[in-house]
Design a protein with these regions (language model features):
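Active-site environment of divalent metal-dependent phosphoester hydrolases
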Residues: 10-15, 39-42, 64-69, 131, ...
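Hydrophobic/aromatic beta-strand patches that form the interior of the parallel beta-sheet core
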Residues: 4, 32, 58-60, 124, ...
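Glycine-rich phosphate-binding loop signature in dinucleotide/nucleotide-binding domains
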Residues: 23-27, 53, 115-117, 149-152, ...
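Core catalytic region of metal-dependent phosphoesterases/phosphodiesterases
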Residues: 2-101
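Anionic-ligand binding region
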Residues: 138-175, 180
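Acidic, His/Gly-rich catalytic cores of divalent-metal-dependent hydrolytic chemistry
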Residues: 168-256
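Beta-strand-turn-beta hairpins that frame and shape the catalytic cleft
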Residues: 1-3, 113-122, 169-173
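Active-site-proximal segments of metal-dependent phosphoesterases and phosphodiesterases across multiple
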Residues: 76-83, 117-150
Length: 256
């Protein structure tokens, strides 16, 4: 089986549509949607595109999906509501209904699939044990190895930190699929992963300027920052140095 892994779409329907166009030209056998699906400017359009895919789809829940559920339920701690990302999640939650909320809430944290040439692959949002733990291109093998050992797979596919990488630690491999909708990379585009029989880190171009104009037109609170150029290495370093206390990259200036 061949698999396309699409992670961290974050409600960016134009980016998703561009990737789907590539998939239609060279279809996979299945698609993995790796979490953080609708927390972004066009949540319902994004869901409509994904639910219309003609291939088997395996879904994962990400930390932003949990945040949207909490926003729908009104259970976000008041202190977190001061954060721009949680304010944006509050906005997203106004577009979904109870059925969408319940569907997001029941998505699994881990999926295992047999992939051509790669045997069993473990798919998770961040790490096998957490949907928030941050692994970056700078993560040392001694920290990564026990995390991958806990998952038990020779190959683990993840996302969460929005930057592609291919790391090995303790004889196991971890590949980050990148982010379709909000990449923290060295250039624009929609980043994703194709598996079977090899591992292919992919990037699909699309009109980011037109996308940002759409985001602003619908009133998305973070429209100006979602696709703004970033210092990819500075963000990864900050994630690595400060873990889950790192600043939100949408407000990051590139100054250490």
């Amino acid at each position: 089986m061949t698999v396309a892994a699409l992670y961290d779409i974050h409600g960016n329907a134009p980016a998703l549509a561009a990737v789907i166009g590539e998939l239609r030209a060279d279809p996979p056998d299945a698609v993995v949607i790796g979490g953080d699906v609708i927390a972004g400017p066009l949540p319902l359009e994004t869901l409509e595109l994904l639910r219309g895919l003609p291939w088997p789809v395996h879904w994962l829940r990400g930390n932003a999906d949990r945040a949207v559920v909490m926003s729908f339920d009104g259970t976000v701690p008041p202190k977190l509501l001061e954060h721009p990302l949680y304010q944006a999640d509050q906005w997203v939650a106004t577009f979904i209904d109870r059925a969408d909320r319940d569907w997001l809430d029941q998505l699994p944290p881990v999926v295992r699939l047999d992939v051509d040439g790669l045997d069993e692959v473990l798919f998770c949002h961040a790490t096998p044990r957490s949907d928030e733990e941050r692994i970056t291109v700078f993560t040392p093998p001694e920290r990564l190895a026990p995390i991958l050992e806990q998952g038990g797979a020779d190959l683990t596919v993840a996302g969460h930190t929005h930057r592609q990488f291919d790391l090995t630690a303790g004889g196991r491999r971890m590949v980050n699929a990148g982010s379709v909708g909000r990449p923290y990379e060295h250039g624009p585009g929609a980043y994703w992963l194709r598996l079977g029989p090899d591992v292919e880190l992919r990037r699909t171009g699309y009109d980011t300027g037109a996308a940002v104009a759409r985001f602003a037109a619908v009133g998305y609170p973070l429209a100006d920052s979602i696709l703004a150029p970033v210092d990819a290495d500075a963000i990864a370093r900050r994630y690595e140095d400060h873990g889950d206390e790192a600043l939100d990259p949408s407000s990051y200036t590139g100054v250490a």
